[in-house]
């Protein structure tokens, strides 16, 4: 079985946050802490290697760990961060989570590791109803396919999944793990629930 110590995990904070009024979501505060800090608190007991993908405010993010930007400058969404993460991580297996999901499961990394098979390329979380494509674990061997995919201008992740050996990790017992805060209203509502 793949061990959590054999993985690296990247927090994806490279988006444009258009629904958050352009404010950098990872740095927006929830209960007096930046969202990214909530994610790190959940993730750091699970893995020794956490990296951050951010395309702006890199100095602010560097307080939390090693920061790198996308290689593709046209903001291809989370796929750009996944691509850059595969390039920067030192392990063969690289996991990804978004910066705006403060309730990540405390066993997320372990569940992904347990689901890895010898021929796995990509593992994607599934909440019982939907796949959660930014909660994922990639093997570095996917990098050439992902590079070609992005160079072609493709952005639909489902097409990449069809090119690779993709499987799904069951999180149907904990759908709240995937709550992400995309708007000021969602942030305010979630903050009231947490208080």
Swiss-Prot record:
The cellular component terms of Gene Ontology attached to this UniProt record, alphabetical and capped at eight, are: cytoplasm
CDD domains associated with the record: MobA
- Per the UniProt entry, what species is this protein from, by scientific name? Vibrio parahaemolyticus serotype O3:K6 (strain RIMD 2210633)
EC number per UniProt: 2.7.7.77
Per UniProt, subunit arrangement is: Monomer.
Q: Do you know which SUPFAM superfamilies this protein is assigned to?
A: Nucleotide-diphospho-sugar transferases
What keywords is this UniProt entry annotated with? Answer: Cytoplasm, GTP-binding, Magnesium, Metal-binding, Molybdenum cofactor biosynthesis, Nucleotide-binding, Transferase
What does the UniProt entry state concerning the protein's domains? The N-terminal domain determines nucleotide recognition and specific binding, while the C-terminal domain determines the specific binding to the target protein.
Protein name from the UniProt record: Molybdenum cofactor guanylyltransferase
């Amino acid at each position: 079985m793949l061990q959590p110590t054999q993985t690296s995990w990247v927090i994806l904070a490279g988006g444009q946050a258009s629904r958050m009024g352009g404010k950098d979501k990872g740095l927006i505060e929830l209960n007096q802490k930046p969202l990214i800090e909530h994610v790190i608190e959940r993730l750091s007991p699970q893995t020794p290697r956490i990296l951050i993908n951010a395309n702006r405010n890199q100095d602010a993010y560097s307080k939390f760990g090693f920061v790198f930007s996308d290689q593709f400058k046209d903001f291809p969404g989370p796929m750009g961060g996944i691509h850059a993460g595969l390039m920067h991580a030192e392990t063969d297996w690289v996991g990804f989570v978004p910066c705006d999901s403060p309730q990540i499961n405390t066993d997320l990394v372990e569940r992904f590791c347990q689901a890895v098979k010898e021929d796995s390329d990509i593992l994607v979380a599934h909440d019982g109803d939907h796949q959660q494509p930014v909660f994922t674990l990639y093997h570095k061997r996917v990098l050439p396919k992902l590079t070609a995919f992005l160079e072609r201008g493709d952005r639909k992740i489902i097409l990449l999944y069809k090119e690779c050996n993709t499987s799904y990790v069951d999180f149907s017992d904990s759908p709240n793990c995937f709550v992400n805060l995309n708007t000021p209203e969602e942030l305010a509502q979630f903050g009231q629930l947490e208080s």
